[in-house]
Amino acid sequence: MIKQIISIIFITLWTIFSTYGFITPFLIINQEKMFVETLKKSFQVLTSFVLKYGFGINLKCNMNITQTKNKVDILIANHIATIDSFILLSMLEHMNISNFIMIGKKDLIYTPGVGLIFMFGDHIKLARNWEEDKNTIDKQLENIKEGIIVLFPEGTRYTEEKFKEGQEFSRKNNLPVYDNLLVPKSKGFQAIYNNLKNKNKLGNLYDSTIILENKNLIDLFKKDSTNVHLINRILNKEELENKDFKSWLLEKWSEKDNLIKTYSKIKYENMYLELDENFLFLNLFIYYNVFILLIENKEFRYYFLTLIVIAYIITYLKRNQFVKKS
């Protein structure tokens, strides 16, 4: 448990230190894509490192995902736990894919470190109001030319209470009753799919089934290691030509439900951690020298603390502007 707690503290300090201390001033002055992409990649590498060595999570995957050149791919997944997003980002990092686009509540921009990645990137920020969100999706997709959109059609993570409510809802409405999954929602997913398809920007449609041996986050603190199985597959887009989108999605979720029941029969490969040495070296080099300077140089200490305070103030003002615009 001590190792896991240290890992959480480490990743929290890293995100605050790296974003507010160094990258924020550059983003405020000029929101160059280079800084955003560097931050995303660096965060991916750190996420993979912490999941593996902090929480002892072993990723096992049945197939790789490839990014389609000059197209926008969509990756859908079940939402089983708090760390699902980090698991998928780590999986994509193992596959050397850093051009990811996340979908989430706009309130995420207030999360230190991760909030900056979500705010300045091309990520789709939702207000949970469909009329507003539909416009946001269409507007944001105009800026996305290439990459992989990662989304959870269930809209919320798995809990026993939500699971039982979903089963009851399905029975009342004559829908498939799942044994391991929540009921997926099709509206947002369909809007993204149709937008990309109509503009000839749609690449591959991927599905990832996440299977955790320990669903409860508390269980991760109690064990030294745990396995996460990822069953990836390419979905046939042509099926949607003659099917209702909602019915098609429910059908795919039934297939996912069966995959979870039989996941032990599938052949997996361990995803070994191959960290990008350039990013690791850059981070370690910067942090080591900064901490040395903080200890040895009083003037720099004051400068650095002032920089962080200014970055927080400017970022807060920028966030208010962002919220008003969106």
Language model segments and positions:
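Alpha-helical bilayer-embedded segments of polytopic membrane proteins, i.e.
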Residues: 1-21, 271-320
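Membrane-anchoring hydrophobic helices of lipid-metabolizing enzymes
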Residues: 1-74, 86-87
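Soluble catalytic domains of membrane acyltransferases
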Residues: 54-217
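Membrane-helix interfacial anchor on the cytosolic side
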Residues: 55-59, 313-326
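Short proline/glycine-enriched turn/loop segments at secondary-structure junctions
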Residues: 217-223
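A glycine-rich helix N-cap at a beta->alpha junction
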Residues: 229-235
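Short helix-loop capping/hinge motifs at secondary-structure junctions, enriched
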Residues: 237-241
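Juxtamembrane amphipathic/hinge helix adjacent to a transmembrane helix
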Residues: 243-286
